[in-house]
């Protein structure tokens, strides 16, 4: 197969940042994807509907000419988010989810939730109003090994949460383990999961063997090869609760290549071609449209996009870096190739 045409896809987990970074990365997504769930972990975080509205306007103002892209905004959950803010979010028409960052779990998560018990009334309001909770699924206790954080989160936080709030819709974002796949398969229909390019294409050996490769460093961290294989099987299975979420996360090159580098992989420059490569290798190109264009919209209760995009099988070079303000942005598979391109 040399060409495939899909319903225009959506990205259900995206970091756009702000300012010069926003201006650099937004065109990569907006020219291919119809919509994206926009992460709220700015500095300061987007914790109110008014802040989300202002951020949305900055995104719309930065769109390239001719782009028809809708940013789906989120709120950053804190220990003190009031139920009234959830009511306002649900009525806004542009806030589509609330994001749970356990405090200290990833980039700009210091203001995150320290104890989910403090959020029970807020979570109940979300369940009542049908506003999904997107979760970064890791515990952050010092005694838990970084490679085990996700499994602990399932047992200690996610499953009890799902059982306590029987109507709450939950998106288990950027899953990385066989344990997460197994959990999703037996979870209620109101629990979905996103899968990233890097977790489907790479394991921890890519990051650590033969030298540390900081541009593979992300959170949740890359896992074992058997976990990667389980993720590929899940993504390509056609299961309706696994869907595309890149977690594309830009950082300046200098912030990645340092003694204490930032977590995040930038994949938006070729996200859909990367997923096509993954699905082709699995013999499942016929299921790419469901994963990329249908499942996420269906889970969020939004209409599927009405237009389409076409991919062509053609080896396409990837730049070593993109200019970004006074620094540069190193993309996933920098200096290499991807087997598909959007035409």
From Swiss-Prot:
Binding of Zn(2+) 1 occurs at: 13, 15, 99, 247
Pathway, per UniProt? Pyrimidine metabolism; UMP biosynthesis via de novo pathway; (S)-dihydroorotate from bicarbonate: step 3/3
**Gene3D superfamilies from the UniProt entry:** Metal-dependent hydrolases (3.20.20.140)
Keywords (A to Z) from UniProt: Hydrolase, Metal-binding, Pyrimidine biosynthesis, Zinc
Q: Where does Zn(2+) 2 bind?
A: 99, 136, 174
* EC nos: 3.5.2.3
Record-listed substrate binding positions: 15-17, 41, 136, 219, 251, 263
The record's catalysed reaction(s) read: (S)-dihydroorotate + H2O = N-carbamoyl-L-aspartate + H(+)
Give the GO terms filed under biological process for this record: 'de novo' pyrimidine nucleobase biosynthetic process; 'de novo' UMP biosynthetic process
Could you tell me which Pfam families the record lists for this protein? Amidohydro_1
Q: Which cofactor does it need?
A: Zn(2+)
Q: Which domain of life is it from?
A: Bacteria
GO CC annotation, single: cytosol
Q: Does the keyword Zinc apply?
A: yes
| InterPro entries (alphabetical) | Amidohydro-rel (IPR006680), DHOdimr (IPR004721), Dihydroorotase_CS (IPR002195), Metal_Hydrolase (IPR032466)
Q: How is the cofactor bound?
A: Binds 2 Zn(2+) ions per subunit.
Identify residues that carry N6-carboxylysine.
Answer: 99
- List the active-site residues: 247
Q: Name one GO molecular function term.
A: zinc ion binding
Quaternary assembly: Homodimer.
The text of the family note is: Belongs to the metallo-dependent hydrolases superfamily. DHOase family. Class II DHOase subfamily.
Q: NCBIfam families recorded for this chain?
A: pyrC_dimer
Any idea what job this protein has?
Answer: Catalyzes the reversible cyclization of carbamoyl aspartate to dihydroorotate.
Protein name per Swiss-Prot or TrEMBL: Dihydroorotase
